[in-house]
Amino acid sequence: MIVSIASQKGGTGKTTTSISVAAALARRGRKVLLVDVDSQANSSKVLLPKYQTLSKEETVHVTIIGRKPLVIHQTEVEGLDVVPSHILLSNTDVELSAARLDRPETRLKRELDKVASQYDDIIIDCPPALSWLTINAFTASDRVLIVVSPGYFELDSIVQISDTLMQIRENFNPDLRLAGFLFTMSDATIASKQSLQVLRQTYTDSVFRTIIPKNTAVKEAHFKKKDIFNYDASSAAANAYSKLVAEMFQL
């Protein structure tokens, strides 16, 4: 299954979710590829300790802009490979908008189709905005998981990204489906409780039962350039992401 993990805005736990879902699947013995198309490259920086030494030719930039095969790197997590991102991806909207005759929305899909048989699951870490990179990710995917953190503006952004999903389904990828809404950074505050209540009232069965708690172990893991399972497999976040993978992939 190819799953895009997306959010309309930053700071929702999207990248943490991408890394954690990929790592949780790998821990279950599955062969996993994480494709980072977020120009901030945070997934890449966590999973590849030597990321800063990579040139753009060793990243997904060469596929999206150069129309060349994916450059796949092994990580220190057994069973988990990554296609890293690059800061220059932040300029892709201008370049891809000028290439419409080339069907720019399919650039990632074309190359993913060539390697998909080598993996049980492919996770795409999308940028925190609606762009040509998001369109490429959704066009290549079977499912989209939308990450939502507590807050009024976070809930408001769901409408936009849901509309994008429907537009991609209508125009580029008729098989695309919503995997569900994942509530992250949950805590005991009123804002968090109200946000979750509104999310469940509005989207009912489309909201995952699993809730991801706010957990300092996640930031500590990132500083150590480790996924949450390699850093603290007994943490609340690790337990939650393990439950999410079981729920989502029925493992």
Residue map of PLM features:
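P-loop NTP-binding core
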Residues: 1-251
